[in-house]
């Protein structure tokens, strides 16, 4: 099982590096913009958003959240709103700032999207897989120190994990990267064209994409395959809509 985790990590890393290399070669993206996109993701979602979660949700040491147990619908709405608010506002702030420095270019949207989505892939994809590798290795060797830290439900989940679920996790991260690129286009166009309905659309589209995983998190959507199918269909739909709206306008 652990070998499949390693393969998935290698594939994700290769996909990310390959995407950046291709974008740099074909579209001459600015690597500084890419780096700032990564910084914007880290500050908005890993610092500011998590700080709000701590203040509002009061997560316990074991990771449990009272709102998730008591009112899952409100928890979903809160999670969707916070993720969209922080990440899309980070895009807005960045492009407004960049616009004051110089004229915006099409490649800026691609560069920022790869930076923002790329670091998300690392944090939510590679980091999760590394943690899973460590825990799974400890369970297989019956490491007593780690076994004591695992709840019964978590232990059952790990022991029942299938190979295809590991690759499915990698597939979801690739879909998420694609969606981050599309969302960046919407905010970029909002700033460039001064049409703030595009910004509102970006907030809504972000929540739209996060809905299926949120439903799965609270147990209302139990099929991992169905979640990924929904995400893939959403990505195709939004990509088509984005191209139809902006292809001739950009």
Task: List where the protein language model places each region.
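Hydrophobic alpha-helical segments at protein termini of multi-pass membrane proteins
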Residues: 1-250
């Amino acid at each position: 099982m652990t070998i499949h985790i390693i393969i998935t990590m290698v594939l994700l890393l290769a996909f990310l590096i390959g995407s950046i290399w291709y974008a740099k070669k074909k579209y001459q993206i600015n690597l500084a913009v890419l780096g700032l996109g990564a910084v914007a993701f880290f500050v908005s979602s890993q610092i500011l958003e998590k700080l709000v979660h701590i203040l509002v949700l009061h997560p316990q040491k074991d990771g449990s959240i009272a709102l998730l147990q008591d009112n899952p619908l409100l928890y979903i709405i809160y999670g969707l709103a916070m993720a969209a608010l922080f990440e899309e506002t980070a895009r807005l702030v960045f492009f407004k700032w960049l616009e004051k420095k110089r004229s915006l270019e099409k490649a800026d949207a691609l560069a920022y999207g790869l930076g923002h989505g790329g670091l998300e892939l690392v944090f939510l994809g590679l980091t999760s897989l590394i943690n899973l590798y460590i825990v799974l290795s400890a369970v297989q060797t019956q490491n007593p120190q780690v076994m004591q830290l695992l709840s019964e439900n978590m232990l059952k989940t790990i022991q029942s994990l299938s190979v295809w679920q590991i690759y499915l996790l990698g597939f979801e991260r690739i879909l998420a990267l694609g969606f981050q690129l599309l969302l960046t286009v919407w905010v970029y166009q909002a700033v460039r064209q001064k049409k703030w309905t595009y910004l509102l659309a970006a907030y809504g589209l972000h929540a739209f994409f996060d809905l299926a995983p949120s439903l799965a998190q609270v147990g209302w959507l139990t099929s991992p395959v169905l979640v990924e199918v929904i995400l893939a269909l959403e990505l195709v739909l939004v990509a088509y809509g984005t191209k139809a709206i902006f292809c001739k306008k950009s």
